[in-house]
């Protein structure tokens, strides 16, 4: 999901250079919120249903052909997008695909991020795909903070977002530390909002809501567009390398980002976010994974425990200007 959010930066730069260019984004309907105001078209993709199989990708390609697409930019580079672009290429449509820099990232990990330059940012890699198709434009400038509606009503005081979750254990803040971080933030700020998915994440958020009167669990209360609107009204967001960090980058909200097994130098740091918000442990064993999806070699995820709740609270204070 964070990959989709990052695409909005690249498309903003492309549309600023080519305002009359017709761009159609093939993605899940829920992600349309990331592209508000960019004058784009959409093709809804149902990867759990009609577009799940090879046949489904060919059907999606046929739909794209009927739309009259002149070129395909594959910024995802996974099996389904390869099938999609190949189907159109076989019908004579020019295609370009992302170069993910796998060797560059492996070298960064092998050297522990020491003495090696950071990998190219994913947003720039997205821009490069469009450049392969002949479009000439600059890398996007960071997003600007703009007024957006507040789904939580009138704001008074300082509001903080907290999102300790990720799809990977190596990028998820430990639960016990998360509870302590919420306590410190709730004691210090007027309102704290817990961003989460469902299941155990939602239960953690509801637990924190029950424990502190100024904490609000967001799951089930707002959709993706409402959550993005809320983030735009927050003073700071605490997030892992996750969707919420990238959503904050879209609306220029300050972020304190916590990094475990992976590293901001691998190209996935929130585009345009202030690097002063980065929290990570200097350990010989990290980074050890590009995506944070490999098990910890020690079994204890010590890199995450090294970033304490007190460190998070103090960094938030710095980011909000206390």
For the regions a language model picked out, list residue spans one by one.
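Catalytic machinery of carbohydrate-active enzymes
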Residues: 1-322
């Amino acid at each position: 999901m964070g990959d989709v959010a990052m695409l909005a930066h690249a498309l903003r730069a492309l549309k600023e250079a080519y305002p009359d260019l017709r761009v159609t984004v093939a993605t899940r309907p829920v992600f349309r919120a990331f592209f508000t105001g960019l004058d784009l078209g959409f093709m809804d993709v149902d990867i759990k249903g009609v577009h799940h199989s090879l046949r489904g990708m060919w059907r999606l390609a046929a739909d794209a052909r009927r739309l009259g697409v002149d070129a395909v930019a594959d910024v995802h580079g996974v099996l389904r997008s390869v099938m999609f672009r190949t189907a159109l290429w076989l019908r004579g449509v020019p295609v370009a695909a992302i170069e993910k820099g796998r060797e560059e990232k492996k070298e960064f990990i092998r050297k522990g991020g020491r003495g090696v330059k950071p990998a190219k940012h994913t947003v720039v890699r997205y821009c490069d795909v469009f450049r392969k198709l002949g479009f000439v434009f600059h890398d996007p400038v960071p997003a600007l903070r703009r007024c957006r509606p507040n789904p939580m009503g009138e704001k008074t005081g300082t509001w903080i977002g907290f999102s300790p979750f990720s799809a990977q254990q190596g990028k998820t803040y430990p639960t016990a530390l998360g509870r302590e971080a919420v306590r410190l933030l709730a004691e210090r700020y007027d309102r704290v909002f817990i961003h989460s998915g469902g299941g155990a994440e939602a239960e953690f958020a509801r637990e924190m809501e029950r424990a502190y009167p100024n904490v609000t669990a967001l799951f089930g209360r707002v959709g993706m567009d409402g959550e993005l609107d809320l983030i735009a009204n927050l003073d700071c967001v605490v997030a892992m390398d996750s969707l919420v960090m990238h959503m904050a980058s879209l609306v220029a909200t300050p972020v304190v980002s916590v990094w475990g097994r992976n590293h901001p130098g691998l190209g996935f740091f929130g585009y345009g976010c202030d690097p002063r918000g980065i929290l990570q442990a200097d350990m010989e064993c990290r980074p050890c994974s590009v995506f944070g999806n490999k098990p910890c070699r020690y079994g204890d995820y010590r890199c995450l425990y090294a970033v304490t709740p007190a460190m998070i609270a103090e960094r938030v204070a710095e980011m909000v200007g206390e």
